Each structure stands twice: as structure tokens, then as C-alpha cells.
Swiss-Prot record:
InterPro entries: SAICAR_synt/ADE2_N, SAICAR_synth, SAICAR_synthetase_CS. The keyword Nucleotide-binding applies. This is Phosphoribosylaminoimidazole-succinocarboxamide synthase. It comes from Cyberlindnera jadinii (Torula yeast). Pfam families: SAICAR_synt. PROSITE patterns: SAICAR_SYNTHETASE_1 (PS01057), SAICAR_SYNTHETASE_2 (PS01058). Transmembrane segments: none annotated. Keywords: ATP-binding, Ligase, Nucleotide-binding, Purine biosynthesis. Its EC number is 6.3.2.6. GO terms for biological process: 'de novo' IMP biosynthetic process. HAMAP family: SAICAR_synth (MF_00137).
Amino acid sequence: MSITQTNLDNILPLVARGKVRDIYEVDEKTLLFVATDRISAYDVIMENGIPQKGQLLTQLSEFWFEFLKPYIKTHLIEVDDIFAHLPKVLSEDRYKSQLQGGSLLVRKYKLVPLEVIVRGYITGSAWKVYKKSGTVHGVKAAEGLQESQEFPTPIFTPSTKAEQGEHDENISVEQAEAIVGKELADKIGKVAVELYSKAKGYAAGRGIIIADTKFEFGLDDDNELVLVDEVLTPDSSRFWNAKTYEVGKGQDSYDKQFLRDWLTSNGLAGKEGVSMTEDIATRSRVKYVEAYEALTGKKWE
């Protein structure tokens, strides 16, 4: 059984319902991020979900928030004991079953209006653009790169943060500077590449290549960067199997590429009202579990 939408009967105000997360306000300084089992591809949410996906995303985000805590402030307050911070009624089974294991209690910060993407390898949309123009996000890239090849150094490639139902738009660093200012854009790019590099090095030791990832940042009262949202999950990243990695082709991945491929091959990419087959949902869940277990070293129960 999958949870594709939460319902807390207005005990907490619903702030937003995103592609995956339902966000509730606990108080003026605190939010509850509930990762549901919804899954989207090509900016469309599937009609059915993937069992335990929300819990897998949440537990993996918690792992990475702890891993990156020495390097940056994060918005995470609590995962395991959220009910101590919530109205007592939410401990009742009908609510607890929706929240347990899939919720992050987080501090509220002013959001930076950018999707902060770091690419270590050329793949996906970056590869498509490079083949046509030899550029990545408007910047001239090295000549002769092959699909899935590692960049000499990771690159910061921002995009706009679109509203629900709209498409994120890849932009240049100069366009990002126009949105948030040069000083903040420079800082974000530097910090994001550093965080990616720390995670990439760790993952390599676990047999996983982090090809690229998306970070989101907030600002605290002192205008210092804070890592927010989810972090380094199969929804926000491309994870590849290092054992089967081979330059010059697409890679075995532990992310939504499996679903994207199925939609494309069936002529369903970008169409509303699509339900995954049980087989696709099950096989997608296996990918999420494999990523969790490989990266954390823990068995998923």
C-alpha cells in the first residue's frame, strides 16, 4: 500500500503540496515535511505511488544531513521523535501511519529562489545540449566529451525554481546572479560544489557514482546559507552503479530513469493521468531500496 496524499484534518495548516512532499506548519518557526509515496517524471505526477518511497527518501535525507552537518548548517530538527513536537492528537494511529518514518521536522528559513544543480558527469539534458552546441548551461565545455564522461571538475548549473505544474528552466550562472546577486550566487556555487564533492567521495567508497544532484538553500537571520529540502536522494540525484559504469553510453541508475524510460517507450512521457503497472512500481521501489542500502550500509526493513 502506498500513501499518495496525507490528510491531517486541518490539525496543522497545509502550507504546500509539492510533487512528492506535503508541507505543514507546526509553528511560526517550524515546518513538517512529509514525503509521500508520490512519484513524478517529466513534471507529471503518476496516479499511483511506490510503497515506502517517502520513508526511503526521508531516511536517506536524514543520513546525508548528518553526513554534511560538519560542513554546513541544515534545516533538520528531528526525524525519529517528531511526535514529541506535534499536537498529541497526531500520535493517533490514523495520523501516525501517515507520518511515521517519512517526516522531517525542520526549521523555517527564507528560501533562495534557485535549484542548485551540480554536475560531475555529462548526462541527461546537459548531454543533449552539449551534443548540439558544445556548451553546458551556456558555457563552452571541453571538446570531445562522451556521454557519461566525468567533467574535469564538477560544475554548478543553476535552474529556476518553478511553481507546481510548471517546468524548471536551466539558466546560466550570469542569470542566477541577476536573480540573487553576484556575491550570493558565487557563494552558492562554491558551497554546492564542495558538498557534492564530499558526498561523491563517500559514495564512491560504497560503489555508487553520484553523477549529479540538486541542492536547495535557505538563508538564516545572519544571511548565512542553510541546506534545506531533501538532499542526495534518488529523486534529486543521479546515482550510478560504479561496477557497470562505462563511458560512451547511458548508465544503470538507482533513480527515476527507470520510470522515465518506461514512459518514453510507451509514448506516455509528459501525459497526465498515467498509472504505473504493478511491475514498474515494484521494480522502481527495488532501485530506491538498493540506493538506500548501498549508501547507508543499513538493511531496509
